[in-house]
């Protein structure tokens, strides 16, 4: 069979089906849209499920795709086998009421024979037990009856993807790899056929004839229209066409393995291959998942990604790597896959950053965690026990970040077993209180507690910042207790409190509970119904139910929260005035440092709109508007025109916050008494959290002052560096220097005190002017320096003699190779002409790099052309190493490409080609 690269196979596939009238649909996200039964996209047909069931109008009747997929059901065997992967790509062609069984079979065989160039006598097929129709179609196309195998529901009835959706009988294509692949049992066994577990027959394409829709309950209902769903694993097909025994030996995965060899210093062999394969596979899953916005987390998809990162880190450790490592593969992965998935180019830097941070987080505790696990196993050995308890496993999880499955894998490698059920029980206990965070936990996980009327907390925080409070209930480690002691983390329920509990987007208050000899730091405040939960750490002394404490919030933090909450209301009003009444709040976060506001709007905000919104809010802030609070019946509140959240549940009586004609909203949060208290308002970021919605991040008050102080300090540092470079190069700042003054911190403080509502707009404009000037002058300085360097390069008489001394001597001529950074092609040609004039029998192989690009210039005299040297031919072969393009004549050729780091190696390769001709 003819060798074909993975990229070539994918291209052949999409071109073929496009010619057959299929719409080529881009791969969907790894997050399945509108399908709660799936954690990840696991097959090509997932994005087409609504089309098969008739749930949506058809945009086309036939489609094809190359779909990225993640499956982790066989995670523990990845790395141990030749073909298991968690990430793979699926080729698929689909019909929605258009063609059916006959055409699907014809397409599959035609593509296999005439495009993949698989010999017909090597193809076997399987069909569902009673599918005589499929058998006839295969035989009509020349597949003999003896190479058609009937299999049951387990093998030849497919679907659905998830718990529901389209499904039906299928027919699969197999490649006969020869009796030698059957091993000692099946080698020459005439009964060995597709369906056998040996490696002789490998399935490479599954044709599903969708006739049914399976409901969530498992019932099979006839589809409104029949359909075709085919799937062919891209890596599997490449393995067969490249005639290797493992998907990890195919061209793309082999490139990743080679990069791991370079980074680790280890060779890929029998002793290291499991580690190499795990890292190769998991890095792909993580790379594509992060690219689709699936970030490491404690639950759901994020937990799976975190588990893959940590599993790969453990296997990297077996190669002697004890530092963040996976993120270093991102560049290689980007180069490999950005042709099929161009969106990854722009995401690569973010992926690299997130991955590095996650690796650092895990490696920080890994060493200690492994030592702790070793202690546990040694203890079990002494006690002659074989089971690691769920409690121990959970301790490794909560303290050292070991995913349950990773601990299980580690202990089973050592011959122990793991108590899964016990781990689950410990996890349930921890749902409320965890070592890492108090935030967002639910009251029902506190043993022996219910939010009863007797535990109602009276909230005083709208008017008070401190109060005398009686302790109604205590919790430590999730359990109800009557007293606590120093050093314990606890949850305290009080009869009355000034602490605001998280709600309406505003985060909970922090502060202290004190009495003589006792101090409790409140790190967060949550609530369940009318019960307020003060969560934190006992810093000093003991506390018992019934004790009276002084409750006091952090007043400055509360003021900052009020600034940002009132600022959020003004922002909402400004958005509706400037963008239109279609703007609806979709969510918000109000913290002491910033606010985040999600709202409905179909497109990104322009620069002018952002300035308008910012100005509108700052005008309201400067207008000194009193903030009015009313408690109204809900009907009355709605009639007053107050805005409310559509999906929020309200009681019969609601609190309404008004700021003149600028804002009127339902709200239970804490606010300023006058808009002037907000100080200043600045938008720092605008983006999209999802289709049809926009997100603004903004800051208020002192945060705005600190923001601009930092912005201008950073800008001043950049300008200082630029001016220093200009002066060092040209002796003065006349042409390239930036002389406009950057406001000092003292001047900025004065501006904030004097300029009021206009200060943010003025500072934004000034910053932009300085940034534009810096960019323009930096570009001009760079070009001038480059021009000077090239002039010096051209005028250097010692360069020619130095290169001639370094030349490689061969029987029929000499060759000089050199890489010059930041030199233009014309200068290289001039240099080559000088060398040729001084030494007629010399071949010049020059390269230069600039940023992410590279250029090659090859030149010689005609005397070497007569001896077999053709610069154009040598260049063409060499540019493959740089993903480049170019060409030329026998005596002169020029080309460019990427991969500047590979230029030196490419010249070595060119030298080896020249050596053959000149020896």
From Swiss-Prot:
What is an example of a Pfam family matching this protein?
Answer: tRNA_SAD
User: Which InterPro entries does this one have?
Assistant: aa-tRNA-synth_II/BPL/LPL (IPR045864), Ala-tRNA-lgiase_IIc (IPR002318), Ala-tRNA-ligase_IIc_anticod-bd (IPR018162), Ala-tRNA-synth_IIc_core (IPR018165), Ala-tRNA-synth_IIc_N (IPR018164), Ala-tRNA_ligase (IPR050058), Ala_tRNA_ligase_euk/bac (IPR023033), DHHA1_dom (IPR003156)
**SMART domains from the entry?**
tRNA_SAD
Task: Give all cystine bridges in this chain.
Answer: none
Query: Where mainly found?
Result: cytoplasm
Compartmental location: Cytoplasm
Q: What is known of its domains?
A: Consists of three domains; the N-terminal catalytic domain, the editing domain and the C-terminal C-Ala domain. The editing domain removes incorrectly charged amino acids, while the C-Ala domain, along with tRNA(Ala), serves as a bridge to cooperatively bring together the editing and aminoacylation centers thus stimulating deacylation of misacylated tRNAs.
Q: What name goes with this protein?
A: Alanine--tRNA ligase
Protein source organism: Leptospira biflexa serovar Patoc (strain Patoc 1 / ATCC 23582 / Paris)
């Amino acid at each position: 069979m003819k060798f074909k690269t993975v990229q070539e196979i994918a291209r052949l596939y999409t071109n073929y089906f496009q010619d057959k009238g299929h719409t080529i649909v881009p791969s969907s996200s790894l997050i399945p849209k509108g399908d709660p039964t799936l954690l990840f996209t696991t097959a090509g047909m997932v994005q087409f499920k609504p089309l098969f069931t008739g749930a949506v109008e058809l945009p086309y009747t036939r489609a094809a795709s190359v779909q990225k997929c993640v499956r982790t059901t066989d995670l523990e065997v990845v790395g141990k086998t030749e073909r298991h992967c968690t990430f793979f790509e699926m080729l698929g062609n689909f019909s929605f009421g258009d063609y059916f069984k006959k055409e699907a079979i014809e397409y599959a065989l035609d593509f296999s024979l005439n495009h993949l160039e698989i010999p017909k006598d090597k193809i076997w097929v399987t069909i569902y037990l009673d599918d005589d129709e499929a058998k006839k179609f295969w035989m009509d196309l020349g597949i003999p009856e003896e190479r058609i195998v009937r299999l049951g529901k387990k093998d030849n009835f497919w679907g659905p993807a998830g718990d529901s959706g389209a499904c039906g009988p299928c027919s699969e294509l197999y490649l006969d790899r020869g009796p030698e692949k059957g091993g000692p049992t099946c080698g020459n066994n005439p009964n060995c056929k597709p369906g056998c577990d040996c490696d002789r027959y490998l399935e490479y394409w599954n044709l599903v004839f969708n006739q049914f829709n399976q409901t969530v309950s498992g019932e099979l209902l006839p589809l409104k229209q029949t359909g075709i769903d085919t799937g062919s694993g891209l890596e599997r097909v490449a393995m067969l066409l490249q005639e290797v025994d493992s998907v990890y030996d195919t061209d793309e995965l082999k490139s990743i393995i080679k990069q791991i060899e370079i980074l680790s210093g280890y060779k890929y062999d029998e002793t290291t291959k499991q580690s190499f394969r795990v890292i190769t596979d998991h890095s792909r899953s993580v790379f594509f998942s992060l690219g689709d916005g699936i970030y490491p987390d404690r639950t759901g998809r994020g937990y799976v990604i975190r588990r893959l990162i940590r599993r790969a880190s453990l296997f990297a450790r077996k190669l002697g790597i004890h530092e963040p490592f996976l993120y270093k593969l991102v560049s290689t992965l980007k180069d490999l896959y950005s042709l099929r998935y161009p969106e990854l180019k722009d995401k690569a830097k973010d992926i690299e950053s997130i991955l590095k941070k996650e690796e650092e987080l895990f490696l920080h505790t890994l060493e200690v965690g492994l030592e702790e696990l070793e202690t546990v196993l040694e203890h079990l050995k002494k006690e002659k026990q074989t089971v690691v308890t769920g409690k121990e496993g959970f301790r490794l999880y909560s303290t050292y970040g070991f995913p349950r499955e990773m601990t299980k894998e580690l202990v089973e490698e050592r011959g122990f077993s793991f108590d899964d059920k016990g781990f689950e029980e410990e996890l349930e206990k921890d749902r409320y209180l965890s070592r890492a965070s108090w935030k967002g936990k639910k009251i029902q996980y506190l043993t022996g507690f219910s939010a009863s009327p007797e535990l109602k907390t009276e909230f005083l925080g709208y008017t008070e910042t401190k109060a005398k409070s009686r302790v109604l209930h205590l919790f430590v480690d999730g359990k109800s207790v009557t007293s606590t002691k120093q050093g314990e983390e606890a949850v305290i329920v009080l009869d009355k409190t000034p602490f605001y509990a998280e709600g309406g987007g505003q985060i909970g208050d922090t502060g202290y509970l004190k009495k003589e000899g006792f101090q409790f730091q409140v790190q967060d405040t949550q609530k369940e119904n009318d019960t307020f939960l003060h969560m934190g750490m006992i810093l000093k002394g003991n506390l018992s139910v019934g004790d009276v404490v002084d409750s006091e919030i952090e007043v400055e933090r509360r003021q900052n929260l009020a600034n940002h909450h009132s600022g959020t209301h003004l922002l909402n009003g400004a958005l509706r005035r400037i963008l239109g009444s279609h703007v609806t709040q979709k969510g918000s976060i109000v913290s002491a440092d910033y606010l985040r506001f999600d709202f409905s709007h179909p497109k990104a905000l322009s620069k002018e709109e952002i300035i308008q919104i910012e100005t509108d809010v700052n005008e309201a802030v400067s207008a000194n508007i009193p903030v009015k609070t009313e408690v109204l019946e809900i009907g009355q509140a709605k009639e007053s025109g107050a805005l409310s959240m559509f999906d929020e549940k309200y009681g019969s009586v609601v609190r309404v916050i008004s700021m003149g004609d600028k804002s009127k909203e339902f709200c239970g949060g804490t606010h300023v008494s006058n808009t002037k208290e907000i100080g200043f308002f600045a938008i720092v970021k605008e983006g999209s959290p999802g289709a049809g919605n926009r997100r603004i991040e903004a800051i208020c008050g002192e945060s705005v002052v600190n923001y601009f102080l930092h912005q201008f300090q950073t800008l001043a540092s950049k300008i200082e560096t630029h001016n220093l470079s200009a002066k060092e190069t040209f002796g003065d700042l006349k042409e390239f220097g930036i002389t406009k003054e950057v406001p000092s911190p003292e001047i900025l403080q004065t501006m904030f005190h004097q300029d009021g509502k206009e200060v943010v707009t003025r500072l934004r404009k000034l910053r932009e002017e300085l940034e534009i000037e810096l960019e323009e002058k930096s570009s001009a300085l760079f070009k001038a320096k480059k021009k000077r360097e090239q002039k010096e390069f051209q005028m250097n008489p010692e360069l020619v003699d130095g290169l001639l001394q370094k030349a490689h001597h061969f029987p029929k001529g000499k060759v000089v190779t050199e890489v010059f950074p930041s030199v233009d092609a014309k200068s290289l040609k001039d240099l080559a002409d000088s060398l040729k004039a001084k030494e007629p029998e010399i071949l010049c192989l020059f390269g230069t790099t600039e940023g992410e690009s590279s250029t090659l210039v090859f030149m010689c005299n005609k005397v070497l052309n007569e001896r077999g040297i053709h610069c154009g031919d040598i260049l063409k072969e060499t540019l493959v190493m740089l993903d480049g393009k170019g060409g030329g004549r026998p005596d002169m050729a020029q080309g460019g490409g990427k991969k500047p780091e590979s230029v030196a190696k490419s010249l070595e390769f060119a030298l080896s080609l020249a050596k053959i001709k000149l020896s």
